[in-house]
Structure formats: C-alpha cells, structure tokens
Amino acid sequence: MIEKNTGVLERYTGPLSRRIQEEYAIGESYYQGEVKRGLRNSDGTGVLVGVTKVGSVQGYLLQDGQRVPIPGQLYYRGIELNDIVEAHRSAGTFGYEEVAYLLLMGYLPTRQELDRFKEIMSQARKLPEGFTEGLLMRHPSGNMMNELARSVLSLYSYDPAPDDTSIENLLLQSVKLIGRFPSIVANCYAVKRHYFQGDSLHIHFPVPELSTAENFLRMIRPDTNYTEEEAHLLDMMLMVHAEHGGGNNSTFVCRAMSSSGTDTYSAIAGAVGSLKGPLHGGANAKVMEMFHYVKENVDPRDDGSIRDYLVKLLDGTAGDRSGKLYGLGHAVYTMSDPRAVLLKKYARHMAEIKGYAEDFALLQKVEELGIPLVQERRGDDTPMCANVDMYSGLVYAMLGIPQDVFTPLFASARIAGWCANRMEELITCHRIMRPAYRAVTTHGRYVPMAERTAPTSEE
C-alpha cells in the first residue's frame, strides 16, 4: 500500500532542492584530462577495466589510434550470435536453453548434455512453495522491475547456502535463477493486472516439456494459447538479449558487486535495478513512446512529413521534449547492431500476419530518415545505426506483451549473461573494484553555529 502523503516532508525538501543543486554542481573544467566521465574515453569507447571470455561486442577496429567502423558483431563464448540464431531458425528448434548453457559452461553442449540441462531447467522453473502467495500477492507493486528485484532478494531466504561462492553452488544458483526469472515475471504481471487493473487473477504453472519461450507465452496469457511462430520469435528475442559483454551497465554492476564478495541474490538484484533505468533496459519503452508520437503526427506515406516531425523531436519541441531520437546510435556499434539486424529480418513476417506491417514500415522510415538528421546535428558523418531497442518494443507488442513487461522480459533473457559474468568475476579476479574520484571541494574551517548565516530563503 502506498503511504499517505501529508505534504510535510515535501514542504521541507522542496525549497531546499535549488540550493542543493547549486552545492552539488561541478564545473565542466574539472572533467578535463585524466577523468573518465561515465567510464568513457574521449573517443566514446569504454575504459578498459578487465578481460572476459563470456561475451564480445565489436563495432569498430582501431587503426593508428582511430576508430574504423565495421558491421557489428556479437559473440557468445567466441561464437557469433548470428550463427547461433540462424542454426536454430533453420532447424526449427528453440535455442535459448543452449545459449544459457554455452554462456554458463563455456562450451556448446552435446545432445545428451543439452537434454539433461533442459530437464534441470524444467525443475528450476518451479517457484518455492508459497512464494507467489506470500510475497507477490501480499505486497503487490505497480512497477514490475522493483517487484522483480525484491523477489530476487527474497530468494536468498529460500536458499540453504546463499553465501556459498563455490563454483558448484554458484552454478546451482545460476540455473535456478535462469529457470525462475520468467516464472516470477509472469506471476508478477498476473498479480499486477489483478490488483492494479481489476482483472481476474490467472496463475499458470510452467509445463516441463516446453521451452522457456513457450512457457513464458503460456504463463503470461490468460487463455495460455500461443502459436509456434510466436514462440520461435520470442525465443530469438531471448537469445539476442542473453549477453552483451561485461561493460554494459547492468553486467558491470553485477561484476562490481560480485567483486565485493556479496551473495548472488544481492548482485543480481543490483543488475535488475540497473536494467530498470531508461538509459539501459528501459530504452525500448522510450522508443515505443516516441513512435506513438510519430504515428499521431505524421503522414506515414510522406517522407517530408516524417522528417519534419523528427526535426521537432530533435529540437525538443515535440514528444517528450528531450531532444532525442530514441533507438538510434550505440556506444560500440557503428555500421549496424547485429541484434537489430536479426529482429528486422525475422519480425517482418510476424508484422504482416499480426497487422503491424504499416508500423514496421514507419519504424524503418524513422531509422532511415533519423540517422542523417542526428549526424547533421552532431556535425559529422560518423556512421551510426539503429540499435536493438528500435525494434524490440514493436516485436514485443506484436507478441501481445504489454509495455510494462518489456524490461522484465529483457531481464529474463539477460539473467544468463549476468550469472556467467558473476561466475567469471569470482573465479578469475579476486580483487574488489575500487575506482577513484577526484575531490574538487575547497577546504575551509568548521564554522560554529553562532557564526553561520541562514539561507536567504527557505519558504
């Protein structure tokens, strides 16, 4: 239950906020030189803080100190994501379980190893007895990512050895979390719909012989019905989002927390909190918000109309007035984001049969017309591309997945990468992460109370 707002605290904190903003302000000049703001180098690349075998993101080559753009590539344990996805699409098989095995174990499984892993995963999908009734239904939340983080922390209490960081126990915890995340998300959504939207409560249990993608669609829909094509498209989404290198914000948070020696549930909950941010996992929802503004204000058959409205978005006079075109550009990818390429390739047919063909075409126009506009604003022609968030929201919408489930479902895929990176951090690093901040305050003496001057206004 949301606590009653009396306004007392707000009347106190409101007037102080402006002074606090002034006190916290740091001049841009302090960020020159050695300071790596946002852990970024001056050319926008990430500061190198470690090495990893789990995932690799490639969008450019370095030649003579200069970035040379290349088509984007994403590797899981040295194997290109595109090859993994294409293999499963050609065979008509579900691939997320194999990807999870590959990321965790470091190698591709044999048929026997994969079948055994799927069997274990089917057992891991079951939530602890009373978990949904005692936690999710007793304390419902309007935000599913907060509910997911709280659920992860609560799993600590169900674990007989939650602080054991042996490889065997880390692997056990990882398999359980990978299995349970989709079940938690599906149940969180059912509870949220019931308590906050007044819908009937439908809790569906996972079916052992079904894949992660099939089970999720079955659990999240009141009638449990889904098509094979829907399940395979969601399976591809899970594979695409399973891992993205150690430097992305949520994975880095997980590794930084793991370096302190904390337990698995705390580290993963921290990653969930990071992914919630609109600059990270919440970006696909911002793309969909922007897209709705575009749809309402343009003629989709007129490129000039679309371009004019995109200019207004960049000017900050339309949409959310942020001055941003969401879904364009990436910290690493330059010429293409391989994840976006895969989504565009395989979502087209679903768009046609689900009645989203016009939306799909308009989104492509936003990409096509938006990139040169952003480049023009930046004053350079450095290659940039649509990122995965440009198309993932529309794919989720085509699958009937509501917007407040977008990021939790992202987490249900990325949990495999988080767990693999946590294991790697604990096995290989053995040193707490401890970056430095340069203090830029001026020194002064302690002023006795009688000599202090009151603020000019606190009313």
Residue ranges of model-derived segments:
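Non-transmembrane, aqueous-exposed alpha-helical and coiled segments at domain scale
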Residues: 1-459
